[in-house]
């Protein structure tokens, strides 16, 4: 399904929060949405590998990577594993790599930027916690909607009329 964050903002102005416009779109889907699963890690992707290997249908992995642009938290292997397990998308407050290859993976990805240097494989970080970045607080089980225009957040699932999709 395609989502139009501009129309969702107009219709649900009192319910949603808008994420600061600092993210770029990567991956094969230009829009995505789902229930938020949170992860906080800094330049370590071990827990990311574990999470994307789990069932992800209807979910979006939101990673607080501390805003690091020194090491990529998302690469082709992570994106493909997430897509294979049904994840709708990944929002990464950090960087990606393998940009050209990511475009061919059926998953939405938004991140701060790209760098060719990969992150450590260590399992350092925390899951299922409130995280703060880009002007919003994201809680596990919030709902997130993303497209080329931006990212919005809601405490509950938004009803999407066919005219908004």
Swiss-Prot record:
Organism lineage string: Bacteria, Pseudomonadati, Pseudomonadota, Gammaproteobacteria, Alteromonadales
Sorted UniProt keywords: Cytoplasm
Family, similarity comment: Belongs to the RraA family.
InterPro entries the UniProt entry points to: RraA, RraA/RraA-like, RraA/RraA-like_sf, RraA_gpbac
Protein name, UniProt field: Regulator of ribonuclease activity A
Localization (cell): Cytoplasm
MF term (GO), any: endoribonuclease inhibitor activity
Top-level lineage group: Bacteria
Keyword Cytoplasm: yes
Function statement: Globally modulates RNA abundance by binding to RNase E (Rne) and regulating its endonucleolytic activity. Can modulate Rne action in a substrate-dependent manner by altering the composition of the degradosome. Modulates RNA-binding and helicase activities of the degradosome.
Pfam families linked to this entry: RraA-like
Cytoplasm recorded as keyword: yes
The gene coding this protein: rraA
């Amino acid at each position: 399904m395609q989502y139009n964050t501009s129309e969702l903002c107009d219709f649900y102005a009192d319910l949603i929060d808008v994420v600061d416009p600092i993210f770029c779109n990567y991956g094969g889907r230009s829009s995505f949405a789902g229930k938020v699963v949170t992860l906080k890690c800094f330049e370590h992707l071990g827990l990311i590998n574990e999470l994307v290997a789990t069932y992800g249908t209807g979910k979006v992995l939101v990673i607080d990577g501390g805003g690091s642009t020194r090491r990529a938290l998302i690469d082709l292997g992570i994106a493909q594993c997430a897509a294979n397990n049904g994840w709708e998308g990944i929002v990464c407050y950090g960087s990606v790599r393998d940009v050209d290859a990511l475009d061919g993976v059926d998953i939405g990805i938004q991140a701060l930027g790209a760098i060719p240097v990969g992150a450590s494989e260590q399992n350092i970080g925390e899951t299922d916690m409130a995280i703060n970045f880009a002007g919003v607080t994201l809680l596990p089980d919030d709902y997130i909607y993303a497209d080329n225009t931006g990212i919005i957040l809601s405490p509950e699932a938004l009803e999407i009329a066919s005219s908004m999709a």
